[in-house]
Regions:
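Fe-S ferredoxin-like electron-transfer domains
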Residues: 1-124, 137-149, 156
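Iron-sulfur-associated redox domains of electron-transfer enzymes in respiratory
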Residues: 1-17, 21-25, 38, 139-517
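Conserved glycine-bearing catalytic or ligand-binding loops at nucleotide- and phosphate-handling centers
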Residues: 130
Length: 517
C-alpha cells in the first residue's frame, strides 16, 4: 500500500524473532563446546546476534540415533528442520537420499525408512554437510587417528595434498579467499611431524598420462572405424561422481575411464614404488591425504583399493581437518616460511594444479593429448574455452584437423543431464569431465564453509589458474619425475604394470541400495 511504513525492528518484531530462536534452541542440544560446527554454526551466530542468554522454554527434546557412514555423520538431534540438506540433495544434486518425514514434534529430515546413509542412494558428495547451518551433518573426523600414526615410531607417515586445498586453507587463518598458501602448508605439515610431505599434483600428472593414453586409444580406434569403442570417455577422478554413476547408471559402467583418482594413484605408488625405495613393508607405511572432499574418506575404504586388507590410502582429511590439526599443534600458520614439497613425489606441473577447478581435468588432458596425437608442440596451453563456472559447458578443440568434442559438468544434477543425453544417443562428445561439487574440487564439501557466498568459490577458481600460470612446466608429460617413474617402474602408460596398480573397475550398486519397510 502506498505510504505504508514497515518497521522491522520494533519491540514486538524483535521479541518475535527472539521467541522463534529460543523455541529452536529449546529443542537443540547445548553441546556447543564439543560440536563439530562450533564457531561456524549459523544458529549460534543468530543467538549471539539477538542477544539470547537464557532459554525460557523447557520441555521434551527430540532424540534420534546417530548415523555414521564412512564419510558423513548425521546427528539428527541437532537438526532444526531448515531442510537445506534436502534441497541441495534433491534439487542441486538430484540424488534424492534425504527428505522430510513424520509430522509435528517427530518431523525430521532422513533417508527413506530412516535407513543408514550407506543403504541409501547417497553418493557421499557431502554437499548436505556444506549446506547444513548447524552440527546435524558433519564429516567423519580422522585427526585423532592421524596423530596416533605420527606418534608411532614404527610407522613411516607420508602426506599428500590436493590442488584445491592450497587455495582455500588460508581462509581458516584469516587470509582472503583465493590466497595461495602452498609453501606455508608444506611447512606446517612438516612441523606436524609427517616424514614426507608430497603433492597429490604429482599423481594428477600421472593420471593424465594414464587417462590421456586411454582417451587417445579410444579416439584412434573410433577414427579407424571400430564401432565397438565406447565414447565419450568419462573422467573418473571424483568419488562422489563415481558413486553416482555406479548407483544410477549401471548400464554405462564401461564408459568411464578406468584410471584411478589421483588420491588412489598416489597411494598405489607410495605403498609399492616408494615403499620399495625406502626398503620397508607397505604395512609399515601410513598414507594420509588432505582433500577438499568428504567422499574421499569413503573412496580410500573401498575394497578394490586395498592389498590383503591394507589400504593404499589409510586416512583422508578434509581441508577443515588440516586447519584443525595445525591449530592443535599450536602452529602459527601466518609466521611460517615458504617451503617446497619433498621430491620426487612432490614434483608437478600446472596441468595438475587445474584439477582443482571444474574443466581442469579435461584441459590438462587436452594439453598432453594434443601433443601425443599430433606430434606437434602446443604453443598455446590455455584452453580458455574449457574454463568457467556454468553448470554444463561444451567446446571443440582442433587436434590438427581432427575436431575433438568435449563436455564439462559440475554438480550431479548437471551430470545427470549429460548422462541422460548419452543414453538417448544425443551426445556428440569424445570426452566428458564431471565433478560432483559446484565449481569442482574448489567447492568441495571438505573446504572451509562459505555459507552460500559463491564469490568465495570464484576467488578460489581464479587462484587455481594463477598457480597454473606461475608453474615453469604446464603439461603433465613434461614432468621429469613422471618420466623417471615410467622408466624405473611402470614401463609405459596403460602398460601391464600400470594397468594393475593405476586402474580400477566399477560395480553395479543399484541393487545395493536397500529399502526395508
Amino acid at each position: 500500500m502506498e505510504g505504508m511504513v514497515v518497521n522491522t525492528h520494533s519491540l514486538r518484531v524483535v521479541n518475535a524473532r527472539r521467541t522463534v530462536v529460543e523455541l529452536i534452541l529449546s529443542d537443540h542440544p547445548a553441546d556447543c563446546l564439543s560440536c563439530s560446527k562450533s564457531g561456524n554454526c549459523e544458529l549460534q551466530k543468530l543467538a549471539q546476534k539477538l542477544g539470547i542468554r537464557e532459554i525460557h522454554f523447557k520441555g521434551e527434546q527430540s532424540t534420534y540415533r546417530k548415523d555414521d557412514s564412512p564419510s558423513i555423520i548425521r546427528d539428527v538431534d541437532k537438526c532444526i528442520m531448515c531442510r537445506r540438506c534436502e534441497t541441495v540433495c534433491n534439487q542441486l544434486q538430484t540424488v534424492g537420499a534425504l527428505s522430510a518425514i513424520n509430522r509435528g514434534f517427530e518431523a525430521v529430515v532422513a533417508t527413506a525408512f530412516e535407513q543408514d546413509l550407506v543403504k541409501s542412494p547417497c553418493t557421499m558428495c557431502g554437499q548436505c554437510v556444506m549446506a547444513c547451518p548447524v552440527g546435524a551433518l558433519s564429516e567423519v573426523n580422522q585427526t585423532r587417528q592421524v596423530i596416533q600414526a605420527i606418534s608411532n615410531p614404527k610407522k613411516t607417515v607420508i602426506v599428500q595434498t590436493a590442488p584445491a586445498v592450497r587455495v582455500a586453507l588460508g581462509e581458516e587463518f584469516g587470509y582472503p579467499a583465493g590466497t595461495i598458501v602452498t609453501g606455508k602448508m608444506a611447512a606446517a605439515l612438516r612441523r606436524i611431524g609427517f616424514d614426507y610431505v608430497f603433492d597429490t599434483d604429482f599423481a594428477a600428472d600421472l593420471t593424465i598420462m594414464e587417462e590421456g593414453t586411454e582417451l587417445l586409444d579410444r579416439i584412434s580406434r573410433y577414427v579407424k572405424g571400430d564401432k565397438d569403442v565406447k565414447l565419450p570417455i568419462l573422467t573418473s577422478c571424483c568419488p562422489g561422481w563415481v558413486n553416482f554413476f555406479e548407483t544410477n547408471y549401471p548400464d554405462m559402467l564401461d564408459v568411464p575411464s578406468t584410471a584411478k583418482s589421483p588420491q588412489q594413484m598416489f597411494g598405489a605408488v607410495a605403498k609399492n614404488y616408494w615403499a620399495e625405495k625406502l626398503g620397508i613393508k607397505r604395512e609399515d607405511m601410513v598414507v594420509v591425504s588432505v582433500m577438499p572432499c568428504v567422499a574421499k574418506k569413503y573412496e580410500c575404504q573401498r575394497d578394490e583399493f586395498k592389498t590383503d586388507g591394507n589400504p593404499d590410502v589409510d586416512y583422508s582429511l578434509t581441508t577443515r581437518e588440516l586447519a584443525e590439526l595445525i591449530k592443535q599443534f599450536n602452529i602459527d600458520f601466518t609466521s611460517l616460511p615458504e617451503e617446497d614439497f619433498d621430491m620426487p613425489l612432490g614434483a608437478s606441473t600446472g596441468a595438475a594444479v587445474i584439477f582443482g577447478a571444474t574443466g581442469g581435468v579435461i584441459e590438462a588432458a587436452a594439453r598432453t593429448a594434443y601433443e601425443i596425437f599430433t606430434g606437434k608442440t602446443l604453443d598455446k596451453v590455455d584452453f580458455t574455452e574449457l574454463r568457467g563456472l556454468e553448470g554444463v559447458r561444451e567446446a571443440t578443440i582442433d587436434f590438427d584437423g581432427t575436431p575433438i568434442h568435449l563436455g564439462i559438468a559440475h554438480g550431479l544434477g548437471n551430470a545427470r543431464k549429460l548422462l541422460d543425453s548419452i543414453r538417448r544417443g544425443e551426445a556428440n562428445y569424445h570426452a566428458i569431465e564431471v565433478m560432483a561439487c559446484p565449481g569442482g574440487c574448489i567447492g568441495g564439501a571438505g573446504q572451509p564453509y562459505h555459507h552460500g557466498d559463491f564469490s568465495i568459490v570464484e576467488k578460489r577458481h581464479e587462484a587455481i589458474y594463477r598457480e597454473d600460470a606461475n608453474k615453469p612446466l604446464r603439461k603433465s608429460h613434461e614432468n621429469p619425475y613422471i618420466k623417471q617413474l615410467y622408466d624405473e617402474y611402470f614401463g609405459k602408460p596403460c602398460g601391464e604394470k600400470s594397468h594393475h596398480l593405476l586402474h580400477t573397475h566399477y560395480f553395479d550398486k543399484s541393487k545395493q541400495v536397500e529399502v526395508e519397510a
